[in-house]
Amino acid sequence: MRMDGKQLDDESDDALAGLARTGSGAAFAVLVTRHRGAVCVIARNMCATLREAEQALQQTFLSAWRDVRDFPAGTSFTTWLYRIAMSTALAQRQRERGRPSYSLEPFLPAFDRAGRLVASEGRWRDVDGTIVEEMEITGVLREALECIDDHARAAFVLRDLLELPLDEAGAILETSPGVIRRETHRVRLMLRGLIDRL
């Protein structure tokens, strides 16, 4: 039985994935439309440049279409697709390595020997040597994300930008919810430390 576009729009992701598994390009197109924004968030925040993000976005959906027949039954389509998106974006980052690596570790809260919080110091200079205060906050945060290790960055993107539940973020990154919670908290502390010094 053929379904029209309106009927397809009303179907669940899993039902659409089942139809796509049998070769329905129309069902897959609905899934692309439905999840393009989230996959774009993953690609844009995991890749260093817009060009890399666009390549990762395209490759994610090409890979998903190519592999949809192997989509594991009983698995959430969203989890499966976002895992492909994250793997694709991380692979893109690996290909584009060669950029200097910086760390936001200095922006984590510091404590003295007695366990008291130590006040942060001064202003931070970004990677180009300009004062961060002169940059747009979005640019500062994007640069800051570039300085965070890939696994912590991935956890942060899934939890705080896509607002996925801990269990789903853990399934996408194939790790425990506890690790996701810890990594996300660590990134929040680093970003807060950075922003507090602006």
Where is each model-derived feature located?
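Short, charged helix-capping/linker segments at alpha-helix termini
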Residues: 2-6, 21-30, 40-59, 177
